[in-house]
Amino acid sequence: MKSLLFSLALIFASTALLQADWTTDYKAALAQAKAEKKLVLLDFTGSDWCGYCRLLDKEVFTQAAFKDYADKNYVLVTVDFPQQKQLPDDLKQQNDSLGEQFKIEGYPTLIVLDADGKELGRQVGYDPGSGPDAVVAKLKSFNKN
């Protein structure tokens, strides 16, 4: 029993460690991208109600293949539109503004920006089971613009 609990604890800990580092501060992300010569990846999500958003998080964002690529190439920004949890007013205002600015019509939406905030490409939706390799390939195609 102890070994089973230890194994489960290791699995949960390793999944948490694989989670890429995301910020919610758009302006700080642009500044960081400029300083580090990276792109910005915006994830427009409904974290507590959007099933495909949850699958994208579980099947892609927690996987080593995505994390390794993202850490080298992007500053990651979560732009969340939850229904159950309350966001601080300034974050809600920022997210609403970004949703309007980028004309978000569905969730999840991934948008790649250069460090000046110019859109290089977007993916709307997530194909369950496609995994990190498909998402990374799509993101790489935006980097060539």
Listing of model-derived features with the role each one plays in the protein:
Residues 37, 45-49, 106:
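Short pre-active-site segment immediately N-terminal to redox-active cysteine/selenocysteine motifs
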Residues 59, 97, 101, 105-145:
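Non-catalytic, surface beta->alpha helical segment in thiol-disulfide oxidoreductase systems
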Residues 41-42, 50, 76, 110:
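Hydrophobic beta-strand anchors of alpha/beta hydrolase catalytic cores
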Residues 15-20:
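Sec/Tat signal peptide C-region and signal peptidase I cleavage site
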Residues 4-14:
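Sec-dependent N-terminal signal peptides
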Residues 45-61:
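Conserved redox-active cysteine motifs that mediate thiol-disulfide chemistry
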Residues 22-23, 63-93:
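Thiol-based oxidoreductase modules, predominantly thioredoxin-like and allied folds used
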